[in-house]
């Protein structure tokens, strides 16, 4: 996608597992999905978006007008990982979201307010030789001046984040969406 400075873009990010992780899926199916792509990174991202006339040295402002949630969300944890692997052995937990009230029922007596934000928001990197890069491909795990996996709840509807353009076109990427 190519856009001009000031354009508004609607982005439908792809959920983890390419949208195949849904309520009712089991651990074996998750492992099959995750193993389907060789050398898969930890996050599913959407992009790049090329901004016409954006050049290294420019500053790119990304403003979030609105974040619209789907009807359900999943929490995926690698087997034996996470904060409490013994207490929560399930790899996938699904939650139905009340997008009108912007809340989720965590348990029968617990409602959690939803405040969605992108976990990954980034621009293209000029340095693709660092410790988080292999053969010119960089992991989304390590944040830096290009953005990346920042997991900042402050990046909500109405916020603007500024990134130094490092490559022609800026190359905007986003994904790993959360709803704190």
Task: State the predicted function of each range.
Residues 3-4, 9-11, 17, 57, ...:
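DUTPase catalytic domain/fold
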């Amino acid at each position: 996608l190519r856009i001009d400075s000031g354009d508004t873009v609607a982005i439908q990010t792809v959920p983890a597992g390419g949208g195949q992780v849904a309520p009712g899926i089991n651990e074996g199916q998750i492992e099959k999905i995750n193993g389907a792509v060789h050398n898969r990174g930890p996050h599913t991202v959407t992009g790049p978006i090329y901004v016409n006339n954006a050049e290294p040295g420019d500053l790119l402002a990304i403003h979030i007008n609105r974040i619209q949630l789907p009807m359900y969300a999943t929490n995926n944890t690698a087997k034996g990982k996470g904060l409490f692997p013994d207490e929560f052995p399930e790899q996938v937990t699904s939650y139905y979201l009340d997008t009108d009230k912007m809340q989720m029922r965590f348990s029968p007596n617990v409602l959690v307010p939803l405040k969605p934000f992108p976990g990954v928001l980034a621009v293209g990197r000029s340095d693709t030789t660092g410790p988080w890069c292999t053969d010119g491909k960089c992991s989304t795990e390590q944040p830096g001046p290009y953005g990346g996996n920042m997991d900042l709840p402050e990046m909500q509807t109405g916020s603007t984040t500024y990134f130094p353009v490092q490559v022609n076109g800026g190359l905007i990427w986003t994904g790993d969406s959360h709803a704190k």
